[in-house]
């Protein structure tokens, strides 16, 4: 993860690949000539979520549409997510304001708390505790790194009396750098993709091992499973 963030900083904070060019002043400081300061909703689509009625059991199921809440991420702290604790049914989806987010979308928890970030491994939807970003011009890696680097900035602009929330309008209006050549986004994505793939594979293996541990440990503790049987 440190390498992922270091690359983002090198490209879009320190501008190391562009040091030989001319720099100009902007509201975000010195930037390469030709680059512009835009909005987050110019490089990605900001999408909210929703919760089907909890009083309707038929709106929830074990194998339906993956549905994620901030609580799920508070447990897993996963960078990549395929599902939450419970899925919603087609009926639940039709009767709520949640929306399907395609693979590669970046999920950002916008309240309670602000700042959980995860990447969708498949089509997925969320509750209203998220303002997610579907990549358009920029790719998944750029948007993920951008949000990671702007959590404190987003928190400082969040509003609310009971608890702070980053609204959809706030997320859409976040300032973001737009290179004069948008292929720079693509080149950055190509560099980061291999790192992301390795991270996803490691997370999957760690999940498999922890699931195996949680299955075997109670059996060993109860005497239902003997250590000798594991060595055969």
Regions found by a protein language model. Name each.
Residues 1-7, 13, 18-51, 67, ...:
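Non-catalytic DNA-recognition/assembly elements of restriction-modification systems
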Residues 12, 16, 75-78:
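Proline-centered turn/helix-capping motifs that create local helix->coil transitions or kinks
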Residues 31-32, 36-179, 231:
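DNA target-recognition domains and sequence-specific DNA-contacting regions of bacterial/archaeal
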């Amino acid at each position: 993860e440190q390498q992922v963030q270091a690359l983002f900083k090198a490209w879009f904070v320190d501008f190391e690949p562009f040091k030989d060019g001319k720099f100009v002043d902007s509201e975000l400081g010195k930037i390469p000539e030709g680059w512009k300061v835009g909005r987050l909703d110019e490089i990605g689509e900001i999408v909210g979520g929703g919760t089907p009625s909890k009083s309707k059991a038929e709106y929830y199921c074990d194998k339906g549409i993956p549905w994620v809440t901030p609580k799920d991420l508070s447990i897993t702290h996963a960078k990549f997510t395929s599902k939450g604790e419970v899925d919603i049914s087609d009926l639940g989806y039709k009767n709520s304001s949640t929306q399907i987010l395609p693979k590669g979308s970046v999920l950002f928890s916008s309240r309670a708390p602000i700042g959980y970030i995860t990447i969708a491994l498949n089509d997925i939807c969320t509750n209203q505790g998220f303002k997610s970003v579907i990549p358009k011009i920029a790719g998944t890696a750029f948007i993920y790194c951008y949000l990671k680097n702007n959590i404190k900035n987003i928190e400082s602009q969040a509003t609310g009396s009971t608890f702070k929330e980053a609204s959809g309008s706030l997320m859409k209006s976040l300032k973001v750098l737009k290179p004069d050549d948008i292929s720079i986004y693509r080149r950055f994505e190509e560099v980061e993709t291999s790192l992301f793939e390795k991270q996803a594979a490691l997370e999957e293996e760690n999940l498999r091992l922890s699931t195996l541990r949680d299955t075997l440990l109670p059996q060993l503790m109860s005497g239902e499973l003997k250590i000798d049987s594991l060595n055969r």
